[in-house]
UniProtKB/Swiss-Prot annotation:
Homodimer. Homooligomer. Interacts with host RB1; this interaction induces dissociation of RB1-E2F1 complex thereby disrupting RB1 activity. Interacts with host EP300; this interaction represses EP300 transcriptional activity. Interacts with protein E2; this interaction inhibits E7 oncogenic activity. Interacts with host TMEM173/STING; this interaction impairs the ability of TMEM173/STING to sense cytosolic DNA and promote the production of type I interferon (IFN-alpha and IFN-beta). SUPFAM superfamilies: E7 C-terminal domain-like (SSF161234). It holds the Pfam family E7. A zinc finger (unnamed) spans 62-99. Plays a role in viral genome replication by driving entry of quiescent cells into the cell cycle. Stimulation of progression from G1 to S phase allows the virus to efficiently use the cellular DNA replicating machinery to achieve viral genome replication. E7 protein has both transforming and trans-activating activities. Induces the disassembly of the E2F1 transcription factor from RB1, with subsequent transcriptional activation of E2F1-regulated S-phase genes. Interferes with host histone deacetylation mediated by HDAC1 and HDAC2, leading to transcription activation. GO terms for biological process: DNA-templated transcription; symbiont-mediated perturbation of host cell cycle G1/S transition checkpoint; symbiont-mediated suppression of host innate immune response; symbiont-mediated suppression of host type I interferon-mediated signaling pathway. This is Protein E7. One of its GO terms (molecular function) is protein domain specific binding. GO terms for cellular component: host cell cytoplasm; host cell nucleus. The E7 terminal domain is an intrinsically disordered domain, whose flexibility and conformational transitions confer target adaptability to the oncoprotein. It allows adaptation to a variety of protein targets and exposes the PEST degradation sequence that regulates its turnover in the cell. Belongs to the papillomaviridae E7 protein family. Residues 31-42 have a biased composition (Acidic residues). It is found in: Host cytoplasm; Host nucleus.
Amino acid sequence: MRGNSVDLQEIVLVQQGEVPENAAVHSGEHSDDEGESEEEEREQVQQVPTPRRTLYLVESQCPFCQAIIRFVCVASNTGIRNLQALLVNSHLDLACHACVEQNGVQGLRHRQWQ
């Protein structure tokens, strides 16, 4: 680096698990400046936190027969909160399988729901 700021040409990004071009090709080869162990190198690589995803059992009520509808989804904390807001605060309902089987989609369009 020359000066006080980093030049774009001086930044080299390597995805985790990739071998840089100047790395030793054979496992027996070692470069002279290879003083750090793999563990020290891993500590230096800053890990990007990924959102933790969890299984959730979601329950809703069919607007036609009031049966409880259950499904499982995998979501982050933000994702499950968005789904909750969508199901609770908006005009969105899920129809149960039995109502769809019994009436069909066209039949449900003509029924009143609560």
